[in-house]
Amino acid sequence: MASSSATLSLCSTFSAHCNVNSRRSSTILCSLSKPSLNLAKPLTGFLSPSTASTSRTAFTVAPKFAESVVEAEPETTDIEAVVVSDVSEVTEEKAKREEIFAVIMVGGRQYIVFPGRYLYTQRLKDANVDDQIVLNKVLLVGTKTHTYIGKPVVTNATVHAVVESQGLNDKVVVFKYKPKKKYRRNIGHRQPNTRIRITGITGYEEYPASPNVAVGEVNL
């Protein structure tokens, strides 16, 4: 009985060993039949967790650009300060130029002129470009302290100007129409003009002036 039990145990262990070996051989055959895939290395086209983390860190580093922009802000403020100073200088120059003005008549029309400004008038005959002209019909001259009112003109007062160009005004369309006559006319006209620049106002000092009076002090 002891010998038979020993033989049975040996057979059982031998069969188990055979089953294990058969399983191992089947796994080896399967591994040989299927291509080996290394899970440690990621396939091309897919991101591993390490690369995804590095890409995320790259995006977090992007705010450095915003830091550089913040550092450049003081330069823009300096530029704005320079522009403001230039504007103040221009306003001071305009104030100096507009200390005096005059009202003149050219071609039956009245114009308010300031030294340094340009003006479009009707075509001045026999006037070429860069010619210096003198306008004698001065109706009024005004300064900060006095006003010279002409009766009808301010005697000895003259306005000096320079001819800059001879041109044409914008086109004016003239349309003619007659009902039930099939009459239509569309005509365009451009009036010739002259551009002059005022250089100075002189000769008004000898004319009797009236002091400037505030509106509240006028006696009616």
From Swiss-Prot:
<keyword id="KW-0934">Plastid</keyword>
<dbReference type="InterPro" id="IPR028909">
    <property type="entry name" value="bL21-like"/>
</dbReference>
<dbReference type="GO" id="GO:0009570">
    <property type="term" value="C:chloroplast stroma"/>
</dbReference>
<dbReference type="GO" id="GO:0003735">
    <property type="term" value="F:structural constituent of ribosome"/>
</dbReference>
<dbReference type="GO" id="GO:0009793">
    <property type="term" value="P:embryo development ending in seed dormancy"/>
</dbReference>
<comment type="subunit">
    <text>Part of the 50S ribosomal subunit.</text>
</comment>
<dbReference type="GO" id="GO:0010027">
    <property type="term" value="P:thylakoid membrane organization"/>
</dbReference>
<protein>
    <recommendedName>
        <fullName>Large ribosomal subunit protein bL21c</fullName>
    </recommendedName>
</protein>
<comment type="function">
    <text>This protein binds to 23S ribosomal RNA in the presence of protein L20.</text>
</comment>
<keyword id="KW-0809">Transit peptide</keyword>
<dbReference type="GO" id="GO:1990904">
    <property type="term" value="C:ribonucleoprotein complex"/>
</dbReference>
<comment type="similarity">
    <text>Belongs to the bacterial ribosomal protein bL21 family.</text>
</comment>
<keyword id="KW-0689">Ribosomal protein</keyword>
<keyword id="KW-0694">RNA-binding</keyword>
<dbReference type="GO" id="GO:0019843">
    <property type="term" value="F:rRNA binding"/>
</dbReference>
<dbReference type="GO" id="GO:0005840">
    <property type="term" value="C:ribosome"/>
</dbReference>
<dbReference type="GO" id="GO:0009507">
    <property type="term" value="C:chloroplast"/>
</dbReference>
<dbReference type="GO" id="GO:0006412">
    <property type="term" value="P:translation"/>
</dbReference>
<dbReference type="InterPro" id="IPR036164">
    <property type="entry name" value="bL21-like_sf"/>
</dbReference>
<keyword id="KW-0687">Ribonucleoprotein</keyword>
<dbReference type="Pfam" id="PF00829">
    <property type="entry name" value="Ribosomal_L21p"/>
</dbReference>
<dbReference type="InterPro" id="IPR018258">
    <property type="entry name" value="Ribosomal_bL21_CS"/>
</dbReference>
<dbReference type="InterPro" id="IPR001787">
    <property type="entry name" value="Ribosomal_bL21"/>
</dbReference>
<keyword id="KW-0150">Chloroplast</keyword>
<dbReference type="GO" id="GO:0009658">
    <property type="term" value="P:chloroplast organization"/>
</dbReference>
<dbReference type="GO" id="GO:0003729">
    <property type="term" value="F:mRNA binding"/>
</dbReference>
<dbReference type="GO" id="GO:0009941">
    <property type="term" value="C:chloroplast envelope"/>
</dbReference>
<keyword id="KW-0699">rRNA-binding</keyword>
<dbReference type="GO" id="GO:0005634">
    <property type="term" value="C:nucleus"/>
</dbReference>
